[in-house]
């Protein structure tokens, strides 16, 4: 390696798996150069969350990061970890600093069949992770009255429309997005489609939302026409826009193998639907891509708290490390790609292939054994699964 990989450690059971993966599957085979940041909750609290900001800035500087799952604290976690403050989601902070879009895709194997029988290839969800209902403000109207939407421009120009004339109690919500954020989202989606050589679908409800959703559609079309149309044609891939309800129907009828770009809420809902329909959230990869081509790889799942508490009691755990392994393989492959190191790219490929070899041989964690068909599967603990992967990786690397 010539350029360091930004390494972000995390919390609970995934932190335990992180060390096992590094010790067994990375360090024996790769001369790893990494810039390390401890995003475990105790250290985030100790640094007043500065470590999260520093790690995101490092990802912007070096271009490729790999991240372990982390805790986003709630009231119970504040008490458990004796925190000074209820710190924000590290993913949200990193996403905001990198101005990135999250792409999630399932890891598919022949013995685990999707619920939708015609899906032959993975479907990647691109979620616009800014604004809309997640940045909304809300009012509870307790009496009759008029709700208005008012915009006061810096020029002094004022726009005002009536939302509703209430004859009784009700609720009111105001939400927003920005052209800058939508444009960044569009660039990230088109670049990722080119990177992975997949068709890109985008869907809103602009027939109903004739200003808000229509602006998303308009910006996507402008960005495509001005910056990406020729490259898409050259690669033989397609940009396709349709309404969100039509998109859902088309996705179910499709064979898969494309990127589905969604607004914030749609992406939140549909990514969970896809992960479940393809088999398991533990088999879902996640990569954050910025408009200027910076990448942060991680597993799509959380810190596996229940298994961690069992681990602390000395009990055996069979926690699925696949998505975390694929975060490492994806990050190392991308680092090799950017630095022109073919051996590193090949290692990423071979590590993933060794994982598939292990599963195809019927060796799996408990969660996967229950899903596998057509193969005599044997459940092993996390250490046993990682050891089996290492054995097959060594064979592949000669």
Which residue ranges define each predicted feature?
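A structured beta-alpha segment of the ubiquitous adenosine-cofactor-binding alpha/beta core
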Residues: 44-57, 224, 228-257
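Glycine-rich phosphate/nucleotide-binding loop
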Residues: 251-350, 357-361
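Internal helix-turn-beta structural module
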Residues: 314-319, 337-398
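N-terminal glycine-rich phosphate/adenylate-binding segment common to multiple enzyme folds
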Residues: 42-159, 265-269
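Flexible, glycine/charged-enriched surface loops at secondary-structure junctions
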Residues: 30-36, 196-204, 228-241, 336-348, ...
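N-terminal alpha-helical transmembrane segments of multi-pass membrane transport
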Residues: 13, 17-18, 23-48, 56-59
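Glycine-rich phosphate/diphosphate-binding loop of Rossmann-like nucleotide-binding domains
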Residues: 1-20, 149-242
């Amino acid at each position: 390696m010539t350029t360091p990989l930004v390494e972000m450690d995390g919390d609970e059971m995934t932190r335990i798996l992180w060390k096992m993966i590094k010790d067994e599957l990375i360090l024996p085979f790769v001369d790893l150069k990494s810039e390390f940041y401890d995003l475990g909750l105790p250290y985030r609290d100790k640094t007043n969350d500065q470590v999260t900001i520093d790690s995101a800035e490092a990802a912007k500087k070096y271009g490729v990061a790999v991240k372990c799952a982390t805790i986003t604290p709630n009231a119970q976690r504040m008490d458990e970890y004796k925190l000074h403050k209820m710190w924000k989601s590290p993913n949200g902070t990193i996403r905001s600093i990198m101005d990135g879009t999250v792409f999630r895709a399932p890891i598919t194997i022949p013995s685990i069949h999707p619920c939708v029988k015609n899906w032959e290839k993975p479907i990647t969800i691109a979620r616009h992770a800014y604004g809309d209902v997640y940045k909304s403000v809300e009012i509870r109207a307790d009496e009759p009255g008029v709700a208005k939407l008012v915009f006061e421009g810096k020029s002094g120009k004022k726009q005002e429309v009536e939302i509703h004339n209430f004859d009784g109690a009700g609720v009111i919500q105001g939400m927003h997005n920005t052209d800058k954020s939508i444009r960044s989202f569009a660039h990230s989606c088109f670049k990722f489609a080119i990177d992975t050589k997949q068709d890109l679908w985008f869907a809103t409800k602009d027939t109903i939302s004739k200003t808000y959703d229509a602006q998303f559609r308009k910006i996507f079309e402008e960005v495509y026409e001005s910056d990406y149309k020729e490259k898409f044609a050259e690669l033989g891939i397609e940009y396709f826009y349709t309404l969100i309800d039509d998109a859902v129907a088309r996705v179910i009828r499709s064979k898969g193998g494309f990127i589905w770009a969604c607004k914030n809420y749609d992406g939140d809902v549909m990514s969970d639907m896809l992960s479940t329909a393809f088999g398991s959230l533990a088999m879902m990869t996640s990569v954050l891509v910025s408009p200027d081509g910076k990448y942060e790889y991680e597993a799509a799942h959380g810190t596996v708290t229940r298994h961690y508490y069992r681990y602390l009691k000395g009990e055996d755990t069979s926690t699925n490390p696949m998505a975390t392994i694929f975060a490492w393989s994806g990050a190392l492959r991308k680092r090799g790609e950017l630095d022109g190191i073919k051996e590193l790219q090949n290692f990423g490929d071979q590590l993933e292939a060794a994982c598939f070899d292990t599963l195809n041989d019927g060796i799996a964690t408990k969660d996967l054994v229950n899903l596998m068909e057509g193969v005599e599967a044997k459940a092993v603990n996390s250490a046993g699964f990682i050891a089996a992967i290492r054995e097959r990786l060594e064979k592949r690397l000669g």
